[in-house]
Amino acid sequence: MLPRHGRYDFSPITTRPDYNWPGGKRLAFCIVTNLEVYAYRKGFGWDPAKTGEPQNQRNYAWRDYGNRVGIWRLFDLFDQLGLPAAHNINSLLYDDHPQIFERIRARKDELVGHGRTNSERQGDLWEIDERRLIDDVTDTIRRMEGAPPAGWMGPAASESNLTPDLLKEAGYRYVMDWPADDQPFWLKTRSGPLLSVPYPAELNDSASIIHRKDNGRDFASMIVDQFDEMIELSTAQPLVMTISLHAFVIGQPHRLRHLRQALQHCVQHPEAGRVWWTTPSAIADFCYAQPPGIIPGEGPSSDPRQR
């Protein structure tokens, strides 16, 4: 018997109900950065030059560039274009990077739980240890921000077989680990539905540039092509376009220039008035407010206490 996840049923996008995003918009556009902290010379972590290179001072420093330099250039770019953003954050980032959080708060951006550090993978943990990890991250963000995060993105999209169950039980409303659709859909958990918000495995600078060896111009072209195609497709159905950015990758000057041009193309597009420039939590709030049957999958009942 083929192993199955049991989290959602098959649903062709052509057979689903139509609806509009807030304000009659048709394409929801999200930018999500990944703000990460790594162990020095230990654990997991990418290398900018050599695939599979052991952890050393060079690849540690390259990744730290994102927090010291890259994210600040991204903040400025988002400000210039008037774009909101969400940020997948490792909770250990709070230990030494207060200025990053000050800027996020000033921009009123969203924080998404992203594990403690990208040097570990929650998919390798026993249930009790994974629950402890999720609780640790949630409690840290709640303590520092006054409220827990609504969403979760696993470090390197890592999940165990129980992750959606544990997230639902910890109070999370959505997850971004399942790149199976261009629309949000409901995941089944042992404690009720959990929303899956689209997050890209492909329109992702780490996947494109580090793993597929594309350059900054290639990645920017992907953004433009994705936007142009999805703005056309969204005439038939409401869609979500999410861009995943890592500050130590796209924040390098030779790539940042191309990202700026791509995002300018999007905000200046003739059909930009049909776009909802938003965040994953706003998408989740919208979906939870819909009556049963609108969002694919088995969602919350009509009882508002379950929303």
Q: What is each stretch, according to the model?
A:
Residues 53-55, 72, 79-160, 192, ...:
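Metal-dependent polysaccharide deacetylase catalytic core of the NodB/CE4 family, i.e.
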Residues 108-120, 131, 168-183, 303:
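Acidic, His- and aromatic-enriched active-site or binding-groove loops in soluble protein domains
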